[in-house]
């Protein structure tokens, strides 16, 4: 079983261009690019939301002072 040579790819590209035309291929490219961009945006938004909701630790020192109270 032989792999794809450069000629196979060239012939396939020519057939696709003849079938669909360059304008349809350009529109398909725009649609695919927009879908990829939207997917990346949604993944980025989910990562930001997850980082905002993640538990955080706060390091602090508590200072106590003694107070005297008088009960009457």
Swiss-Prot record:
It is a single-pass membrane protein. The keyword Magnesium does not apply. GO terms for molecular function: protein transmembrane transporter activity. Residues 51-72 have a biased composition (Polar residues). The keyword Transport applies. One of its GO terms (biological process) is protein transport by the Tat complex. Keywords: Cell inner membrane, Cell membrane, Membrane, Protein transport, Translocation, Transmembrane, Transmembrane helix, Transport. GO terms for cellular component: TAT protein transport complex. Residues 47-72 are annotated as: Disordered. Pfam families: TatA_B_E. The chain crosses the membrane at residues 1-21. It is found in: Cell inner membrane. InterPro entries: TatA/B/E, TatA/E. Part of the twin-arginine translocation (Tat) system that transports large folded proteins containing a characteristic twin-arginine motif in their signal peptide across membranes. TatA could form the protein-conducting channel of the Tat system. Belongs to the TatA/E family. The Tat system comprises two distinct complexes: a TatABC complex, containing multiple copies of TatA, TatB and TatC subunits, and a separate TatA complex, containing only TatA subunits. Substrates initially bind to the TatABC complex, which probably triggers association of the separate TatA complex to form the active translocon. This is Sec-independent protein translocase protein TatA. It comes from Acinetobacter baumannii (strain ATCC 17978 / DSM 105126 / CIP 53.77 / LMG 1025 / NCDC KC755 / 5377). The gene is tatA.
């Amino acid at each position: 079983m032989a792999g794809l040579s450069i000629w196979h790819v060239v012939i396939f590209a020519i057939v696709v261009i003849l079938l669909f035309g360059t304008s349809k291929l350009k529109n398909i490219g725009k649609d695919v690019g927009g879908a990829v961009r939207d997917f990346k945006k949604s993944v980025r938004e989910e990562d930001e939301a997850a980082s905002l909701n993640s538990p955080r630790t706060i390091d602090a020192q508590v200072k106590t002072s003694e107070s005297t109270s008088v009960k009457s």
